[in-house]
Amino acid sequence: MTENFGFTACRQLLQMFLAVIFFHCSEFVLVIAIHGKNNVTLRSLLISKNYALAMTCSLLEYFVEIYLFPGMKEHWVISNTGLVMVIVGETIRKLAIITAGRSFTHLIRRYPNDQHKLVTHGIYKYIRHPSYCGFLIWSVGTQIMLCNPVSTLAFAAIVWRFFKERIPYEEFFLRQFFGSGYEEYARRTNSGIPFIK
């Protein structure tokens, strides 16, 4: 099995671990920078049981496939496409967080507060939910980077379904808070998630 863990496997796994570590640490640091360390909990790391299970399954797929079909992981063009997706997704998400500033939270606000503003400039001018768009691209990109066909499809379907349920729920409150301003914004701006209006 050690002959299967050549340069490509080491590179792909290192990129995956660095992508995951950077994603979570940068989210945590941004939450502290924007909201102050008194408003930060371990939930700010965005690691849930379902997320940990998904990542574990993706690594399991990787190791099974590299053992049974080592050539399957040698598609550099596919792997590098995934790496580009990870970088693009990460960039879109972080631009969303920085642009929204104190209006950005990881939890859906159900009650308005003075710091919550309707953000329609920057990346929000083009994408209504850029943090979700970025996460979808990032998460699917991690699996393409590993040349994991099963996890690529599973991550795409599961993350898409999560946002299909979350976006209408979140937008219910945004319409309550911002009224016709949000209606007009939603009408002219794409959600950023395929097939979700």
PLM region descriptions:
Residues 1-120, 137-197:
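Membrane-anchoring alpha-helices and their flanking helix-loop junctions
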Residues 120-121, 125-133:
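Histidine-centered phosphotransfer motif of kinases
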